[in-house]
Amino acid sequence: MEIDSVVVAVDGSPSSLLAVDWAADEAFRRGLGLRLVHASVRERYERGVEDDGDPGSERKLIQELLFTAAERAELRRPGLELTTEVLAAEPVTALLETLRPAPLLVMGSRGRGGFHGLLLGSVSLRVAARSTYPVVVVREVGQQRDSPRRRVVLALGPHEAAAATGFAVEEAVLRRADLHVVHAWPDGPEAAAALMDTVVEHATKLLATASAQQTDSFRAAVVRMSAQGPPTDLLLHEAVSAELMVVGAHRNPGHLGLQLGPVNHAMLLYAPCPVAVVAGTPFPDESGHAA
């Protein structure tokens, strides 16, 4: 696969079309192309079979929805390099294996199944929980902008990854946004403070490096937000005016794939902004080993 394109999964649903909009903007910011894909397990068995010309055939319908999505992306970001492809596999397998590696995969939160959250449960959630590259889930929610400056939120958990911090910093720089590092803990404020210090220090260094390469005067700020209490409540509140929330998935010995945890799961289901899930390892300890 080409690695110079943002990838967006398309199924023709309103949610996936919102994902196309978001992905087109993201590709434009990054100076990348946009690859629009649709997964169809039937295509695996029908490759090489001549199209019968039936305008109602699945193959024709897939071509139509990809064309419509590509046209939408072109109208949103004229001149963006676009490619379309039908992946001959069931969706989860296609998106996890066929697209590896990818700089970024964008998905809608709700597909054609008709039940709220069905696609998120059956495809988006499984892909986000197992992917080794960043996955952004875009919800059908109107984005509220009540802050004077743009905001990217980095949600800290007990196993926060350096990769998630790096991705959040990158997004803040691309969007000319401040980075809000948010952490809530049920108990143990000392450990929570230590984690916050580690992440903020790392993010500040990354932002300083990025700022040295910027040609304009904007400089992103790192804002700390921590509180004792239920993490879900605090994070959902902070997500209201955010352009993006970034969460980290971690590997748990004895389990296959990555672990999202209940808080990250809740963010994917309910956060009123796009949510990026970034795989990675915890920050190294002083000895250089993963904590």
Segments the model singles out, each with a brief description of its role:
Residues 17, 34-36, 59-66, 102-108:
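Conserved N-terminal glycine/acidic-rich loop preference
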Residues 1-2, 15, 56, 72-105, ...:
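Structural beta-alpha unit
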Residues 107-126, 244-270:
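Glycine-rich, Arg-bearing micro-motifs that act as flexible, cationic patches
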Residues 1-52, 150-195, 212-222, 244, ...:
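Small/aliphatic-rich secondary-structure junction motif
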Residues 102-146:
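Hydrophobic alpha-helical segments and helix pairs
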